[in-house]
């Protein structure tokens, strides 16, 4: 079975521009694309923290170091400059990869400069004013339990007599 898992996210970026007459997509600073492991043309979900809008589009590369997050095409009706957004990329993977994937979680400041890189989707940086500690603790406990369960299964397999 294949599962769709969080691959990366850019958390609470500020939309810097919107162009209704552009041919679709979201323009993302190349530095942010690299940090979040996004490729040009890759599908992303955009969640607008400011107004609750949610949509899917694809990424195009913006000028490196510019901090650009540009909403293009019809999405400009839903998301405006100044809105806070979360860009989310998912990956389709087999069971083994799904259980071991460590997403790239990128937090940015108001100018879309990277302030923290992580792998815990439930973590909120200190001083951000965001809730997340409980989710991080729950995630760590769940991960530890999964590792213990996996280790027990491996031990059981190793102890089976060969045929």
Curated annotation (Swiss-Prot):
* EC supergroup of this enzyme: lyase
This protein's superkingdom? Bacteria
Q: In which pathway does it act?
A: Cofactor biosynthesis; (R)-pantothenate biosynthesis; beta-alanine from L-aspartate: step 1/1
| PTM section of the record | Is synthesized initially as an inactive proenzyme, which is activated by self-cleavage at a specific serine bond to produce a beta-subunit with a hydroxyl group at its C-terminus and an alpha-subunit with a pyruvoyl group at its N-terminus.
The record's section on SUPFAM superfamilies has: ADC-like
State the Gene Ontology BP annotations. Answer: alanine biosynthetic process; pantothenate biosynthetic process
Question: What keyword terms does UniProt attach to this protein?
Answer: Autocatalytic cleavage, Cytoplasm, Decarboxylase, Lyase, Pantothenate biosynthesis, Pyruvate, Schiff base, Zymogen
Q: What is its main location?
A: cytoplasm
EC number of this enzyme:
4.1.1.11
The note on the cofactor says: Binds 1 pyruvoyl group covalently per subunit.
Q: Which GO terms describe its cellular component?
A: cytosol
Q: Which GO terms describe its molecular function?
A: aspartate 1-decarboxylase activity
- Subunit details: Heterooctamer of four alpha and four beta subunits.
Family the UniProt entry places it in: Belongs to the PanD family.
Q: Which NCBIfam families match?
A: panD (TIGR00223)
Q: Which HAMAP family match?
A: PanD
What name does this protein carry? Aspartate 1-decarboxylase
Question: Gene behind this chain?
Answer: panD
């Amino acid at each position: 079975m294949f599962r769709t898992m969080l691959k990366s996210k850019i958390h609470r970026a500020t939309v810097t521009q919107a162009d209704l007459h552009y041919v679709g997509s979201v323009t993302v600073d190349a530095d942010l694309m690299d940090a979040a492991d996004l490729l040009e043309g890759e599908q992303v979900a955009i969640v607008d923290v400011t107004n609750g809008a949610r949509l899917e589009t694809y990424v195009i590369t913006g000028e490196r170091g510019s901090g650009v997050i540009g909403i293009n095409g019809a999405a400009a009706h839903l998301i405006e400059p100044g809105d806070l957004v979360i860009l989310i990329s998912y990956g389709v993977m087999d069971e083994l990869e799904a259980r071991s994937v460590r997403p790239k979680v990128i937090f940015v400041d108001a100018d879309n400069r990277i302030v923290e890189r992580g792998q815990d989707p439930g973590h909120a940086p200190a001083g951000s004013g965001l809730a997340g500690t409980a989710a991080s603790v729950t995630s760590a406990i769940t991960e530890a339990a999964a590792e213990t369960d996996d280790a027990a299964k491996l031990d059981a397999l190793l102890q089976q007599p060969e045929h």
